[in-house]
Amino acid sequence: MMLLSSSYSGGQFPGVSPLGTRPKRSTTVVPRPVVTRATAGGVRNNLEVVGNAGTLQGMDIDELRVIVRKQLQGVELSPSSYDTAWVAMVPVQGSRQSPCFPQCVEWILQNQQEDGSWGHSAGPSGEVNKDILLSTLACVLALNIWNVGQDHIRRGLSFIGRNFSVAIDGQCAAPVGFNITFSGMLRLAIGMGLKFPVMETDIDSIFRLREVEFERDAGGTASARKAFMAYVSEGLGREQDWDHVMAYQRKNGSLFNSPSTTAASAIHSCNDRALDYLVSLTSKLGGPVPAIYPDKVYSQLCMVDTLEKMGISSDFACDIRDILDMTYSCWMQDEEEIMLDMATCAKAFRLLRMHGYDVSSEGMARFAERSSFDDSIHAYLNDTKPLLELYKSSQVHFLEEDFILENIGSWSAKLLKQQLSFNKISKSLMPEVEYALKYPFYATVEVLEHKGNIERFNVNGFQRLKSGYCGSGADKEILALAVNKFHYAQSVYQQELRYLESWVAEFRLDELKFARVIPLQSLLSAVVPLFPCELSDARIAWSQNAILTAVVDDLFDGGGSMEEMLNLVALFDKWDDHGEIGFCSSNVEIMFNAVYNTTKRIGAKAALVQKRCVIDHIAEQWQVMVRAMLTEAEWAAGKHIPATMGEYMSVAEPSFALGPIVPVSAYLLGEELPEEAVRSPEYGRLLGLASAVGRLLNDVMTYEKEMGTGKLNSVVLLQPLAAGGAASRGGGGAPAPAPASVEAARAEVRRAIQASWRDLHGLVFGSGGGSSSSIIPRPCREVFWHTGKVASVFYQEGDGYARKAMRSMANAVILEPLHLQE
């Protein structure tokens, strides 16, 4: 039986926070759900969301959603003082006497901080960082070039002097290429006659760091190094081969979509297309410019990904659909903004496929070989995020032989493991990488992922390219919504658990001493595929039928006599006329009455949704299941070994007991399922594939236990014949198979599991099931996909209910409060 046996995902390079500048808001408190907060003194309860989230006074849920929706629809780009300064340095063509973009100069004059700096702090404490020093130096240079803002220049130089030690501190996080860009601008400033109130030895230290950077043996190939040096060209100035750099120019005229690099090329090479890009950029955005442009697609996809990871994407379903429609259009037109960037392309591919868009893996072909990474800036910087995005995208394949995605998955996994082993992954990203490598995306518990992401979410997200930029203008609102939704969901789950416990007592299921009746784990099995709060009826029906199928399975698996098995099968066949049969034991009476009366209750609720009676279909599912279980019991008693895998699976699939669980719950999802839909070949295929995945996973993980009890499974069946001409049944006196034959059989079963996964994924999300021609509503198709995930989770290490880890997981999802960062 089936149940028995960070936050924002970045990675684009160059890239930008998907969420833009943070608007100023008040900092008092709204009523909060009780959560647990970690502090230096231990754990305490608090009604606030979380310390680092700040507070949101007087806002209800709808107001929070409005803010997030506004940000999602038009992601606000965070202004980059550094890039704005470089654009401000560009002169009018044919003249070096006046700026081409005076609005950028004016913005610099209007946005100096009181301490004399420009740029963003990397955290709530406002500490000085290398990005602030870099931005301040760039702004000082821009003002000095045009001989304006002398007081601004004086205050900026003073700020740099007071904090110069930060620039040479190797422990401080640095923007990409800092040792080149900062030292290059410092040399330019000194050449202009600017005086820095610092010791000569400190300035020499900066130039030594520059030489070290040039000599550094970084990751990747020579091509990766060339690309990196082109990206930080503004730090090289006249030393750069600008003809070589222009090889990286894109159709929009930019270099790497970087305003600073493009501005430097406009200064040094007078490239018309580069200037056109800057004109277009400044005309659209006014004064300041971002660290990367255009970036709308990537930024919006990151926000969609964040909302999904935090468990609140359903609140913004229409907005997400609009974004994905736009992304799909860009994909089909092969637009550079998506296709040239590793992280954007991978994230777009994954999200589009998982939302049912028909996108070919051919769009990922440019990343099929490891050289695509080794020759990139990502390799030079040992950048993990795009690598992780590629690995995730490689898992969403439908075809048995999709060599593009298989290749991407192979080399990206290898590199991620290498980065882990050499400790090259940041602490903030390491849990996500470890989790992705350990658990395939079809073996994850989304609601548990949501909880972990909420607990680790950083509302002060600060990303670094050549310059830093703030995270989302809606991070606090996202966290507040996620905390509220998770807390409410837990309260609903806990009510459902109490109801299940009372239902068990009502039908005397706890009196069945041979059976495992575990409401908590059964509810977890329902929460995994049906976690949205509003699906309570479907979840309760799933949980009840999970308990009931487990009880019936235990009867057929040694808990009852053959007389009781035959009696129960006859009762199910008669169904409403079961009084004609009678009960041969109290155990049979308890089981049948529990199934029959619970099904009547569920059927009444389903009839309201479906506008028809569905009891006959539900009864059929029970009848098919118990007949299959009886066949297995007869096989065991007679020591019968099926001649083929086909014969075995024809019984093993229905005996896995999804029939009375999944189709019944599907009736309660709010979607109409007409008779022709549930009788269609497509519906039968969905149920068959989900059952095959579960049964084969069970066989692989419980092989040794079942072999010891003489119970047949696919691993035993597929073993090459051992000495004596028969496969061992365990306990029957036949010789045990050689270890090699066992591993070969298990490998064959795993291949069958993978094939079933691919077919199921394609039927649910691909053109086979994702098209409008399907008569089965998408939410109903998806529940079969999530059913397979339940099996993967429950059988990661063995018999699902027997694992202590499963109870721990159930506690974490249903009972334990959030444990949030301070």
UniProtKB/Swiss-Prot annotation:
One of its GO terms (molecular function) is magnesium ion binding. It comes from the Eukaryota. Its EC number is 4.2.3.33. Mg(2+) 3 binds at N698, T702, E706. The keyword Transit peptide does not apply. Mg(2+) 2 binds at D553, D557. Induction: By chitin oligosaccharide elicitor and UV irradiation. SUPFAM superfamilies: Terpenoid cyclases/Protein prenyltransferases (SSF48239), Terpenoid synthases (SSF48576). Its cofactor is Mg(2+). The keyword Magnesium applies. Binds 3 Mg(2+) ions per subunit. A motif (DDXXD motif) lies at residues 553-557. Mg(2+) 1 binds at D553, D557. Keywords: Lyase, Magnesium, Metal-binding, Plant defense. Belongs to the terpene synthase family. Stemar-13-ene is a putative precursor of the phytoalexin oryzalexin S. Phytoalexins are diterpenoid secondary metabolites involved in the defense mechanism of the plant and produced in response to attack (by a pathogen, elicitor or UV irradiation). Catalyzes the conversion of syn-copalyl diphosphate to the phytoalexin precursor stemarene. This is Stemar-13-ene synthase. It comes from Oryza sativa subsp. japonica.
